[in-house]
Amino acid sequence: MPRSSIVSRIAHDSYRHSPSTMPSGRWWENLDCNFCDRPEGFELEPWDWARVNATAAVDQVMKAWGGTLLAGTLPVGFLPSFTRDAYTDTPEDWQVYTDLVAEGSDPLRFFRPPPDDTRVTHYDPNWGFFRPDAGRCLGLKFESPYVPFNERLAPTFRNYRNNSIARARYWCHDKGPRPTLVAIHGFMADPYWINERFFSLKQFYDRGYDVVLATLPHHGLRAERSSYYSGQGFFTAGISGINEHMGQAICDLRVLLGWLRRERGVDKIAVTGVSLGGWTSALLASIDEDLEAVIPNVPVVSPVDLLLEWQPAGGIVRAGLFALRWSVRKLREIVAVTTPLTYQPKLPSERLMIIGGVGDRLAPPKHSRLLWDHWGRCRIHWFPGNHVVHLDRGEYIAQMESFLDQLDFRYVEAGEQDLAEAG
């Protein structure tokens, strides 16, 4: 592995020669059952140690709060049921997904291509903190064409009114088409005004990119009126629902990417995402080979192991496993169909980059490390912050810019391009 693949000071020496954490074969069976309890192996200087532990303490509080919210949601759809309740799983439902991963690792068997004729409309949004001087800010929406792979969930999805309309925010220059950066928010973190700043979208826009913020299923305006919080619907249809909602997220994003290519003439698209969005963007790397780059930020790669760490929700999951006499491996197998570790990326490692937080306790760095090993130890940057407070964020934004520049992900005026070709 070239030394330059780790582009941050933290963990540079301690990780460079360390053995891979990614097991061979079926990862859901061969990954340590106690992966969620595995310590983080960082060697930190005193100043970094202080910052990491301070931010990690904040994450522990947020994790308890998030775990409490999920604990009120999980019993509805996660407790095993042998009835045909629309909001509970059955063994037959689980078999649908385990059969898929048993038969091979082709992601397109579950993530089926969306139709090409989905109509995307745009409108002027009522508000937005970033209004470009030279360009437009547009709201995008379209009817999600997603049909659940598990046919039993089709009536449930048809009953979702708000979630059936996919949405995004699009900042585009007057002159185009431009290289476009698509950003995907995290769980419960959908407000555009937050993500405009978090992803430094103005900075990327000023570099000549067009930028898009996509809204995940059951978040923001896609949340149903009955939801207590944004993102709740992602978990109210059981384990099957998580798989299908991730399937819908990928489907809607592929519609959006197709629209950018066909209708806007965009030929260079990079995708980044944080947390749940990092999980989603990592999956896209295994599905869309035409992407220029994928940059997951504090990604989740084994949601079952993550959930076991979020108390009290993790206790509910452990109780369910005990009642079924299952190990965590069985639960991993059910969600493996929507996990990036199950598939090989279609992009070469030179077009992949991971950003991980050393003090992150909501999506711990062991997840970023596992994906890094799975992706052949591509470029990675470690920052000394938690899930929300990304200390030294300016450093990894600069690394992202440098990474994209190396891929020639830039806008060149027509006259400049002619001169370059003539030279």
List where the protein language model places each region.
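N-terminal targeting or regulatory segments adjacent to alpha/beta-hydrolase or S9 domains
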Residues: 1-153, 160, 207, 417-423
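Proline/glycine-enriched tight loop/beta-turn segments at coil->beta junctions
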Residues: 160-165, 172-180, 206
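Cap/lid segment of the alpha/beta-hydrolase catalytic domain
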Residues: 182-247
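Alpha/beta-hydrolase fold nucleophile elbow
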Residues: 263-275
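Hydrolase active-site cap/lid region
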Residues: 280-329, 382
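Short beta-strand/loop motif that positions the catalytic acidic residue
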Residues: 347-348, 353-356, 360
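Conserved alpha/beta-hydrolase "acid-adjacent" motif
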Residues: 361-367, 392
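Catalytic histidine-centered segment of alpha/beta-hydrolase-like enzymes
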Residues: 385-398
